[in-house]
From Swiss-Prot:
A Pfam family per the record: PAPS_reduct
Keywords (A to Z) from UniProt: ATP-binding, Nucleotide-binding, Nucleotidyltransferase, Transferase
Pathway listed: Sulfur metabolism; hydrogen sulfide biosynthesis; sulfite from sulfate: step 1/3
Assembly information from the UniProt record: Heterodimer composed of CysD, the smaller subunit, and CysN.
Protein name: Sulfate adenylyltransferase subunit 2 1
CDD domains assigned: Sulfate_adenylyltransferase_2
Region Disordered: start-end pairs: 287-315
Keyword ATP-binding: yes
EC number(s) given by UniProt: 2.7.7.4
Length: 315
């Protein structure tokens, strides 16, 4: 049995022991954050408001304490995020003292692009991938931090910490650079950029153990509560506002659910759960055999869809 599971079975479930591997992961991530800040002219941190972004923001604030991290936050708003995510984003950005850049693809808005009118693939491409590329070009960012981890998905498993992108923001796995002994090559030509993943070597369990140890706030959607949902294609979709079209006879019902991963609310499935605290989330996760991203509809558009999205410029 793992040390995490043993600790959670003790008489005080909130008293997890210090984990030395978390210290090593923290040190590695802080080193990467400082390296990028020193090496690049105009870095930015992509803040998607999820648990990984929350850990990455916490690490950035630690890395540059007592000062403010020397780069802004960037949030690509698809206009379909959970309302709780937007409120949490604004609160955490204000608390950090970092500038927050919010970018919406206005061309997509003008065309009426959405997950129901055009489908998840088109919506994701226009309102996330193309919007991200617009924002990077608009502000001239040459390095962008992201919270992706190698354990999440197959294409991310072969991602470098410094992920090279050409002048069109495209990712070519064959053009990536070796990173022997944690030495990173950030040399780029004008117009090229690097996506940087400080959490590459973390796992989902590491993220939650660190959130617990550090007391990092996360969006309440991660905790079980009664929420209005409808079941579609095996996914429990939360009815977050009145834009969700209901099928004839379809009636939202209250269920105790939470989210393991967060995205656009019509494309993100909840899971039935009783976990209302971080230790309970960790215990539930240790007993689960399902993938963290099982509830992300965009991952199931086609086989290998994540790698195609990355080649097109997706984070």
């Amino acid at each position: 049995m793992s040390s995490a599971a043993t600790a959670l079975q003790g008489p005080q479930p909130n008293a997890l022991p210090a984990a030395s591997h978390l210290d090593r992961l923290e040190a590695e991530s802080i080193h990467i954050l400082r390296e990028v800040a020193a090496e690049f002219d105009n870095p930015v941190m992509l803040y998607s408001v999820g648990k990984d972004s929350s850990v990455m923001l916490h690490l950035a604030r630690k890395a540059f304490h007592p000062g403010t991290p020397p780069f802004p936050l960037l949030h690509v708003d698809t206009t379909w995020k959970f309302r709780e995510m937007i409120a949490f984003r604004d609160r955490m950005a204000a608390e950090s003292g970092m500038a927050l850049r919010v970018h919406i693809n206005q061309e997509g808005v003008a065309r009426g692009i959405g997950p129901f009118s055009h489908g998840s693939a088109v919506h994701t491409d226009v309102m996330k991938t193309q919007a991200l590329k617009q924002a990077l070009d608009r502000y001239g960012f040459d390095a962008a931090f992201g919270g992706a981890r190698r354990d999440e998905e197959a294409s991310r498993a072969k991602e470098r910490v410094y992920s090279f992108r050409d002048r069109h923001h495209r990712w070519d796995p064959k053009a990536q650079r070796p990173e022997l002994w944690n030495v990173y090559n950030g040399r780029i030509h004008k117009g090229e950029s690097i996506r940087v993943f400080p959490l590459s070597n973390w796992t989902e369990l590491d993220i939650w153990l660190y959130i617990h140890r550090e007391g990092i706030p996360v969006v309440p959607l991660y905790f079980a509560a009664e929420r209005p949902v409808v079941e579609r294609d095996g996914l429990l979709i939360m009815v977050d506002d009145d834009r969700l079209p209901l099928a004839p006879g379809e009636i939202p019902r209250l269920e105790r659910v939470r989210f393991r991963t967060l995205g656009c609310y019509p494309l993100t499935g909840a899971i039935r759960s009783e976990a209302r605290s971080v230790p309970e989330i960790i215990a539930e996760m240790l007993d689960s055999s399902s993938s963290e991203r099982q509830g992300r509809a965009i991952d199931h558009d086609q086989s290998g869809s994540m790698e195609r999205k990355k080649r097109e410029g997706y984070f």
